């Protein structure tokens, strides 16, 4: 049979994702910060979109004076009565009158226009920047568009770098040494450890290794003790040296921290050359040291998480679910501007496209809010016991259950719960927190939430251990089974490792050591 090429016609139907549909999907999974940035970009591109003004007036409610050129007097502006009333109003306001007179005097004295030297506009501001009260708290005008709230700095602590910069002049009088020290300060991580190589630093700064080591030795005497260490052992050694407790036995202990992590106390006693009582005293001193000397300082401006949904108890005993108005985007379509400008046929096509895009955006934002409300309301209905009684009553829940209840697709529910937060009487939770896998119950009972088992029952069993009765993974399985929870041993081991809980052998060594320390 010979092979040949032929042409065929076929009709078919398929779904095509339009740009508008892709945009609605993207908006659904955005956080409110990302959404505000996106809307600000759209307002900048689309002349029909605008933010509402603070007094509640926007768009077509600005009045007929919008068509008049700025600074053009109106018809009644030339009347004597209107001029007298305005003059009387100005003269009655001491602040405005005094300000205008002061401005005139400055213009004469500076031989320049005051507004050119000190403009009223402090620089470029975000389109959604707060006004009125917010202007007294914010610091706009950054070239990068940064917008900080002064409330973030009121209760803020001194940063680690600022704290060290205040001490450097007292230990390093030489300016060259101070420059090297500042380079070291810039290389610190949030825990206060130095993340750089001394040889590389010396070559980069064009100085000798001896001078670099001299500067580092001086910096390691600063407060907090242990700062500028390059390892945990060096951090502990610096703190012990400042306490005058860095003797040969303690040096051997610090040099073998891996044995301490394994609770191999027999080997540590032999290496340190001490008996059990002295070793316990040394371990007590180690526990009093700070492994993260820079942890008590602010790393930067704190960023508060704003909830997208707020849940409150209602008067009828249920729950009132509301969208947070502070996170809802506010954007309007200026229909009156479209009607006035489209009288010119040349602009009609462009503005019609802008109007279509603006209407689609507003409908998408409205649909996004309704979808978040539906998903949040169903989550609250499913997790009613958790809101009333706590994490021990958290029910197992998956995306499919919520999607079927609200008649939406699982992917839609997944996008809604991504990076969205709910404020409840129990605290602030991400929406994904309420979705946990189920754990089978013994003899076909009610299933349990994996998060509830980990957070309450599993941890409670570990905390109730005694030095002479440490539970192994098999023991935990048996005790959970008595409580109606069916878990495999490998699942218990996985939960234990995820919660950073040591094995039964290591826990037994640690509890016995702590008991001996408490006994002395």
Curated annotation (Swiss-Prot):
Annotation: DNA-binding region: 398-417
Species of the source: Rhizobium etli
Name of the protein: RNA polymerase sigma-54 factor
Transferase recorded as keyword: yes
Residue ranges annotated as motif RPON box: 488-496
Any one Pfam family match given in the protein's UniProt record, by short name: Sigma54_AID
InterPro entries assigned to the protein according to its UniProt record, in alphabetical order: RNA_pol_sigma_54, RNA_pol_sigma_54_core-bd, RNA_pol_sigma_54_DNA-bd, RpoN_core-bd_sf
Purpose of the protein: Sigma factors are initiation factors that promote the attachment of RNA polymerase to specific initiation sites and are then released. This sigma factor is responsible for the expression of the nitrogen fixation genes (nif operon), GlnA and DctA for dicarboxylate transport. The open complex (sigma-54 and core RNA polymerase) serves as the receptor for receipt of the melting signal from the remotely bound activator proteins NifA, NtrC, or DctD for the expression of the regulated proteins.
Keywords for this protein: DNA-binding, DNA-directed RNA polymerase, Nitrogen fixation, Nucleotidyltransferase, Sigma factor, Transcription, Transcription regulation, Transferase
Gene3D superfamilies given in the database record: Homeodomain-like, RNA polymerase sigma-54 factor, core-binding domain
Gene: rpoN
GO biological process: DNA-templated transcription initiation; nitrogen fixation
Stated family: Belongs to the sigma-54 factor family.
MF GO annotations: DNA binding; DNA-binding transcription activator activity; nucleotidyltransferase activity; sigma factor activity
Regions annotated as coiled coil: none
One Gene Ontology term, aspect cellular component: DNA-directed RNA polymerase complex
């Amino acid at each position: 049979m010979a092979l040949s090429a032929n042409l065929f016609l076929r009709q078919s139907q398929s779904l095509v994702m339009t740009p508008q549909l892709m945009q609605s999907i993207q908006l659904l999974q955005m956080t409110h910060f990302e959404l505000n940035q996106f809307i600000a970009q759209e307002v900048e591109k689309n002349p029909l979109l605008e933010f509402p003004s603070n007094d509640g007036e926007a768009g077509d409610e600005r009045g007929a004076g919008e068509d008049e050129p700025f600074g053009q007097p109106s018809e009644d502006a030339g009347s004597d009565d209107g001029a007298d009333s305005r003059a009387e109003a100005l003269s009655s306001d001491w602040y405005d009158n005094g300000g205008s007179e002061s401005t005139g005097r400055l213009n004469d004295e500076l031989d320049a226009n005051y507004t050119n030297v000190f403009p009223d506009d402090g620089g470029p501001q975000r389109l959604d920047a707060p006004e009125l009260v917010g202007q007294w708290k914010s610091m706009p005008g950054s070239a990068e568009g940064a917008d900080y709230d002064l409330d973030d700095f009121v209760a803020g602590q001194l940063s680690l770098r600022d704290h060290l910069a205040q001490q450097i002049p007292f230990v390093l009088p030489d300016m060259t040494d101070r420059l090297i020290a500042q380079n070291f300060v810039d290389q610190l991580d949030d825990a206060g450890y130095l993340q750089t190589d001394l040889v590389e630093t010396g070559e980069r700064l064009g100085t000798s290794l001896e001078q670099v080591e001299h500067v580092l030795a001086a910096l390691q005497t600063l407060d907090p003790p242990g700062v500028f260490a390059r390892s945990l052992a060096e951090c502990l050694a610096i703190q012990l040296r400042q306490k005058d407790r860095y003797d040969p036995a303690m040096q051997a202990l610090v040099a073998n921290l891996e044995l301490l992590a394994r609770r191999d106390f027999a080997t540590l006693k032999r290496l340190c050359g001490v008996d059990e009582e002295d070793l316990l005293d040394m371990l007590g001193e180690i526990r009093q040291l700070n492994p993260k000397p820079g942890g008590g300082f602010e790393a930067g401006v704190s960023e508060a998480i704003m909830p997208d949904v707020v849940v409150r108890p209602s008067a009828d005993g249920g729950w009132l679910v509301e969208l947070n108005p502070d996170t809802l985007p506010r954007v309007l379509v200026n229909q009156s501007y479209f009607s006035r400008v489209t009288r010119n046929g040349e602009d009609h096509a462009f503005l019609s496209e802008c109007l279509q895009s603006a209407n689609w955006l507003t409908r998408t934002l409205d649909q996004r809010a309704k979808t978040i409300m539906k998903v949040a309301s169903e989550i609250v209905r499913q997790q009613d016991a958790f809101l009333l009684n706590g994490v021990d009553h958290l029910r197992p829940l998956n995306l499919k259950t919520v999607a079927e209840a609200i008649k939406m697709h699982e992917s839609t529910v997944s996008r809604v719960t991504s990076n969205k937060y709910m404020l409840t009487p129990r605290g602030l939770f991400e929406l994904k927190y309420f979705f946990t896998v189920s754990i089978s119950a013994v003899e076909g009972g009610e299933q349990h939430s994996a998060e509830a088992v980990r957070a309450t029952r599993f941890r409670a069993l570990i905390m109730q251990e005694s030095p002479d009765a440490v539970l192994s993974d098999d023991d935990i399985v048996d005790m959970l089974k008595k409580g109606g929870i069916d878990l495999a041993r490998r699942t218990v081991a996985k939960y234990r490792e995820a919660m950073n809980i040591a094995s039964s052998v290591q826990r037994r060594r640690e509890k016995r050591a702590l008991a001996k320390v408490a006994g002395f």
